[in-house]
Every structure is written in C-alpha cells, then in structure tokens.
A protein has these predicted regions:
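N-terminal secretory signal peptides that target proteins for export/translocation
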Residues: 1-2
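Bacterial N-terminal signal peptides
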Residues: 5-16
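Boundary at the C-terminal end of the N-terminal hydrophobic targeting segment
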Residues: 16-24
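Short coil/linker segments at helix-helix boundaries
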Residues: 24-27, 34-48, 57, 65-120, ...
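Helix-loop segments that flank and shape redox-cofactor active sites
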Residues: 54
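Acidic donor-binding loop at a coil-to-helix junction in glycosyltransferase catalytic cores
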Residues: 60
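Terminal, low-structured helical/coil segments at or just beyond the last alpha-helical repeat
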Residues: 217-219, 230, 235, 241-280
C-alpha cells in the first residue's frame, strides 16, 4: 500500500490558499502559498511567519502557517499506526505542535475580534472556521486524539455563516466540504448524529463546485487539491490521477504529487490501495 501526501487539512488541508483583499494578498503571501503547494512546508511556514510581522492585522499568514506546521508534523511522524508512540519518539514534533497551537490561538483571537466589530465579516468567519478545522484535523487524524469539539462547532457555525452571507465564498465551500467528509468518514453513526451529520456525497458536491468555479488561482488550486485528496481516499483513482497531472504542471516541485503519479497507472488505475495525507 502506498501512502501519498499532498495536505492538505484540512484542510485542513490542506490546504490553504486564499481569497484575500489586496491589503492581505501581496507577493510574499503568494510565495508562501506556492511553497506550501509545492510541499515545501518549512519554507511556507517561515514566509508566513515573516508576513505576520509585516502585517499585524492579516489573518491569512496564520492560516497558511498553521497548515504548513501541521504538514511538517505529519511528515515527521511518519507512517506508524501507533501515533502516540511515534510522537514520543519524534524529536521535532513537540516544537512543531507548540508552534501550531500558538499560531492557532493568535489567529483565532484576531478573527474573533474582527467579528466582534463586524459579525458579517465573511473572511473573518472563514478564517476562524478554517483555523478551527485545522486544529480538529491535526488532533483527530494526525495525532489520533479525539478532542477539539468546541473548535469543531465553532468551525461549523463560522463556515455556515460565511456561506449564508456569501454562497460564492469558495474557500469556505471547500472547508465546509471537509467538515462533511470528516464527520462522514471518521465518526460512528451515533457520533455523526451528535455532530450535526456529515455526508460524503455533500463533500464531493462542494469540492467539485469549488474546483470548477472561476476563482483566483490559489483558490482554485486549493479546491482541486481537496477534491484530489477526497478522490484518493475514496479510491476513485482514475479521476484523482487526472487532477494530479494538472496540478503537477503548476507545482512541479511537489514530490508528493510526483510519488502519486509514479504509482499510476499500475497502482492508481486498477484501484489498489493508495492513501494520501493532505487534508484539509
């Protein structure tokens, strides 16, 4: 079985891109985003940290940095099924987790402050939802810890509010699709009911809509990575391969895309197990 990474978490994973105002979206942010989608997570995290210092009010650097830190942590843990043991043996993981939690907390506080001033700020709603989704995905899948339920509910409410105000907010559409996918695939039936329900079908509909929308470059790329990840997990490997081929043209340095494509068609197209680790 192959384990192929993109992140992607969540996501969430995951991947992060942004529909940003001109104030937040300078070339340095694009550099951080491109590094992330090329699977150069340390570079992406460093660039995002520099952006935090240069624009104290921008939320995007916190989302990019926490996503990059999550993927660094995931890569450092490796493939061990015993996630707790792997974390204890990982020399770099405690500092990565500490940095992730610190930046998540700061970003959450900034987003909540913006929403106190303007409850209809759909970008603040999105970033609050996405930061919380990153937190939930890191703990649930990467660390194997069932925690973060308050973050889950805040993510769900924030993303739903953003989409109610702006149904064309494609980043929120992708993040909300990941909520549906996570609940549908990671929770028992009873827990799914408690968490408000989840639907893999709805997740694919949302991801496909966002991937096919006429959006800014990194917004579309994030949606395509999300759809690719879901397709890989669902063993719809022929379509996943076609998407990966398109993405590899824009992100030739992404060795995880290359690893996936190197397994095609022998592994991918015949439906044998291929696992990605790129959400959300």
């Amino acid at each position: 079985m192959y384990r192929v990474a993109f992140l992607v978490l969540i996501a969430a994973v995951a991947l992060p891109a942004s529909s940003l105002s001109a104030r937040e979206g300078g070339p340095a942010l694009a550099d951080a985003q491109r590094a992330f989608f090329n699977a150069r997570y340390q570079t992406a995290a460093d660039l995002a940290l520099a952006l935090q210092a240069s624009d104290a009010e921008a939320l995007a650097p916190y989302e990019v940095r926490t996503s990059a830190l999550h993927f660094q942590l995931r890569d450092a843990l490796g493939k061990s099924p015993d996630k707790g043991k792997a974390f204890k043996l990982c020399a770099t993981c405690p500092e990565l987790l500490k940095a992730f939690l610190t930046d998540t907390k700061k970003g959450q506080a900034m987003a909540r402050a913006r929403l106190q001033s303007d409850p209809a700020d759909d970008d603040a709603l999105f970033f609050l939802g996405k930061l919380n989704l990153n937190y939930v995905w890191l703990h649930l899948e990467t660390l194997g810890r069932k925690t973060g339920w308050s973050e889950y509910w805040e993510a769900r409410r924030s993303l739903d509010a953003a989409l109610e105000d702006n149904p064309r907010h494609m980043r929120a559409r992708v993040a909300r699709a990941w909520v549906d996918y996570i609940v549908a695939t990671k929770m028992t039936r009873g827990t799914r009911w408690v968490l408000g329900g989840g639907s893999k079908k709805s997740a694919f509909i949302g991801a496909r809509e966002a991937a096919g929308a006429d959006s800014e470059f990194f917004v579309r790329v994030e949606a395509e990575f999300a759809l690719w990840e879901m397709l890989v997990r669902d063993r719809q490997l022929a379509e996943a391969t076609a998407i990966a081929q398109r993405l590899a043209l824009d992100f030739p340095e992404n060795h995880k895309l290359a690893n996936f494509l190197n397994a095609a068609p022998a592994q991918n197209l015949n439906g044998r197990g291929v696992q990605s680790d790129t959400a959300p």
